[in-house]
Amino acid sequence: MTDNNHYENNESNENSSENSKVDEARAGAFERFTNRKKRFRENAQKNGESSHHEAPSHHKKEHRPNKKPNNHHKQKHAKTRNYAKEELDSNKVEGVTEILHVNERGTLGFHKELKKGVETNNKIQVEHLNPHYKMNLNSKASVKITPLGGLGEIGGNMMVIETPKSAIVIDAGMSFPKEGLFGVDILIPDFSYLHQIKDKIAGIIITHAHEDHIGATPYLFKELQFPLYGTPLSLGLIGSKFDEHGLKKYRSYFKIVEKRCPISVGEFIIEWIHITHSIIDSSALAIQTKAGTIIHTGDFKIDHTPVDNLPTDLYRLAHYGEKGVMLLLSDSTNSHKSGTTPSESTIAPAFDTLFKEAQGRVIMSTFSSNIHRVYQAIQYGIKYNRKIAVIGRSMEKNLDIARELGYIHLPYQSFIEANEVAKYPDNEVLIVTTGSQGETMSALYRMATDEHRHISIKPNDLVIISAKAIPGNEASVSAVLNFLIKKEAKVAYQEFDNIHVSGHAAQEEQKLMLRLIKPKFFLPVHGEYNHVARHKQTAISCGVPEKNIYLMEDGDQVEVGPAFIKKVGTIKSGKSYVDNQSNLSIDTSIVQQREEVASAGVFAATIFVNKNKQALLESSQFSSLGLVGFKDEKHLIKEIQGGLEMLLKSSNAEILNNPKKLEDHTRNFIRKALFKKFRKYPAIICHAHSF
């Protein structure tokens, strides 16, 4: 509606608008305007001017383009407008545009000015969404990204970021083996590529202290040593691992970092940024390079009400986003989960209810690194007057370090040893323990199978398993659940939604991270291929062009510069196997042999041959394992012996006189004979001697 229409409305409804001072003012303004117009026409008639003289040009109707206003009044009103413009210019505020077309008839000029405002704001928003366009696209600088673990799998995270002269390694984690890797407790990344580039590695950069990010550090330092940068908790837990491995002297490589304080590491400038996750003191990384800024989120969720009241440093992330980020590497673990991940503090009401209603002992099992989860459980144990027994080596160690470093504060008098549990009534005891993943050597498993020295599960026990099974551990978790239920314990697991929350961002948190960082290029990390592929779709929905996203797998090498992202090669990657009881690596060939034995059995042959007669001696020995039953073994051995007799008769002197060739000749025959009979390739143990 135009200003004139406002005035006409108010004049016709003057009596009904008396209670409004604003309406009265407008009506008065219209009356004064009408009187001025009337006097103007009367003066014009007295001066002999045309009686149909038009009103000043700024009141002319815009649909009369041929009607020219009087020059005198045109100049007069031009002066008025110029004066108004000068006055506005002198009082102009940055970010504010004054409207000049206030009193004109119609809305064309008014809307033009508003449209200019729309265009200006749209331009500002587009520039705000794409600050990375400030980067120098002519720069020849680039960085190379090489994941050695954590892509195509859950866990085992390790990544190399390098320039031609310098490199950093982000995290060094372990993962759990799938079922069937007999005698293998953990997997660690293959360090071969690090040996190739060792002369330019400036440091190991740790994002947080979970096993899938620090578990491989002692094995790495047995082979290579570099400065190791991290927050106090990360270094504390790594230091404890080094003690167990006899590497205490390598603590001299540790560098304690301060968050929000960029430091130089080789050619990189790195800042640790506080992030919330399921372990204390987690960090994202801002890595400044000559090519541009890289943000690595580490594992994260955006928890606004964390237990320690230290939420994610969104301001610092946004700070780098506004400056312009070339590349974002972001956690993909929960990329299939819609919405947001609940806060760690939401567990409290469920814990409160369970502890309040428990009639006997409460046994709570979770990841030993989830210190805030353990802390909350202990707080409710104290609230309901229970003594706390912490059982399990890793649980005791992590809790002690967190207390000593001042991350948590708990009264020492509330704690008892495992051998003191029996001295207290069941309803006055809380046991915090390891074993949430069904590990056969864990305290919970040994309690459930009556193998623990001091504690066995009772029918009145409440067992809270406050964790989800890591992929690959489902069968182990199911086994321990079966043992607990057979003991008639009450088990709180997945049916209680509020006793466990994830430490990883769901889709809405991933979107917020993408919107804060506004990267030009995006590499989703941490997860199997289906996780990073889903994260890619989320990034596209947040405005990252599909051509600027690459889905990596372990061993891929991707080069990124201000104007491009491309795969440039593939390096050898894989896993090394570790026996966690001896802390020793297991050769790949040993694991393969174990798989052969488990899947197809073993056949052993020690033969003695008379070269002249080309015949087996009676002292030859044969045995099998996992092929046939005891009754059928004699028949199988007789078949193999008969076949070998025929083989020796047709063998030439060169084979019979060479023990190595005779052994290979015998092994190949047995292998083929067993495959023909069983359609399997058992492990063959063969020794041959000729006389």
Swiss-Prot record:
Annotated effect of mutating residue 547 to A: No effect on cell morphology
Residue segments, region Loss of region decreases protein stability, still able to interact with RhpA, but has decreased RNase activity even on ssRNA: 1-132
Cofactor(s) named in the record: Zn(2+)
GO MF entries: 5'-3' RNA exonuclease activity; identical protein binding; protein homodimerization activity; RNA binding; RNA endonuclease activity; zinc ion binding
GO biological process: one example: rRNA processing
Effect seen on changing residue 654 to A: Significantly decreased homooligomerization
Main location: cytoplasm
Compartment list: Cytoplasm
A Gene Ontology cellular-component term: cytoplasm
Free-text activity regulation comment from the record: Catalytic activity is regulated by the balance between homodimers and homotetramers, with homotetramers being the active forms of this enzyme. Acetylation allosterically regulates the homooligomerization state and hence the catalytic activity.
Binding site for substrate: 500-504
SMART domains, alphabetized: Lactamase_B (SM00849)
Domain characteristics, as noted in the entry: The first 132 residues are not conserved outside of Helicobacter. Important for protein stability; a depletion mutant expressing this truncated protein accumulates more ureI mRNA than a depletion mutant able to express low levels of wild-type protein. The truncated protein still stimulates ATPase activity of RNA helicase RhpA. The C-terminal domain is required for homooligomerization.
Name the record gives this protein: Ribonuclease J
Gene name tied to this protein: rnj
